[in-house]
Amino acid sequence: MPMIKEVRALRIFFTGVGGQGTLLATRFVGQAALEENLPVLMAEIHGMAQRGGVVESSVVLGSAASPTIADGEADIVIAFEPLEAARALPKCNPKTVVITSTTPIPPF
């Protein structure tokens, strides 16, 4: 069995609207980390995802005790919808990198 690499925790917060692929993107990142023998923790919050509601998930790479990302702890925020990006701002700190879509999804 390959040795697990020791790395500083990198906290990635994903957010979007149901049906945008938020959970799929989370799984891709988590699987890629596993294939590189990096320690990884993942968490998902589905909410009303099937009805166009918010979907939040997190991937924590490296040494961490929990997949939960508290306010101010995100290193990267990936938002698939701009209003969800705004809702995720409390997770950010001055060094957080935010990647977001600029196309809003109207509620239905």
Q: Can you say where each PLM-predicted feature lies in the sequence?
A:
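Active-site cofactor/cluster-binding pocket
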Residues: 1-108
